[in-house]
Amino acid sequence: MKKLFFCALVAMFAFAGCGVMLKAPVASVKSNLYKYSYVYVVPTSGVTSSSGVYGGQYGVYGGQTKTINPSETISGYLMKIGFTPVPTVTEELADKTLVVSYGYTGRRQLGLFAYASCIIIQMRDAKTHEMVASCEAEGCGDDETDDILQAIYSGLNAIFE
């Protein structure tokens, strides 16, 4: 009986976050993005996730630390599809430049032990400051850095599909 209870308990923990779907990314594109050649991605600070198992008197074994910088991830994605990043917005390039902003909007509980990280990305015309495109997306991975990476890629894919 104890063995059955233990198996049921393990199964409950293993499937606590399963079966819950992420919300589909919501994207709004108001203008042709490909009329722009340059992007200025507003700098963000890095996000770090750590995990580990304590191994006794000699410290942590099997630990892992991951760090991502959302603005660098967004910049890399945009470079890959043909945009050129610029370090600042200049007057001579303003009419061909998008200003891209990223924001972390929190978490959404998915199940007993799982949650999704939610983000928003906005793209504005550098000259007029009008909204050109935006998206809201969420991601759920092994840790917070994976969650944010998934959400960024999901949102950008929705904008550029």
What are these regions (language model features)?
Residues G17-I81:
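A structural "domain/chain start" motif
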Residues M1-V20:
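Sec-dependent bacterial lipoprotein signal peptides
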Residues Q150-E161:
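Short, solvent-exposed cationic patches
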Residues A24-P25, Y58, T67-D146, Q150:
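Surface-exposed short loop/turn segments
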Residues C7, K30, L110-L112:
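Residues embedded in well-ordered secondary-structure elements
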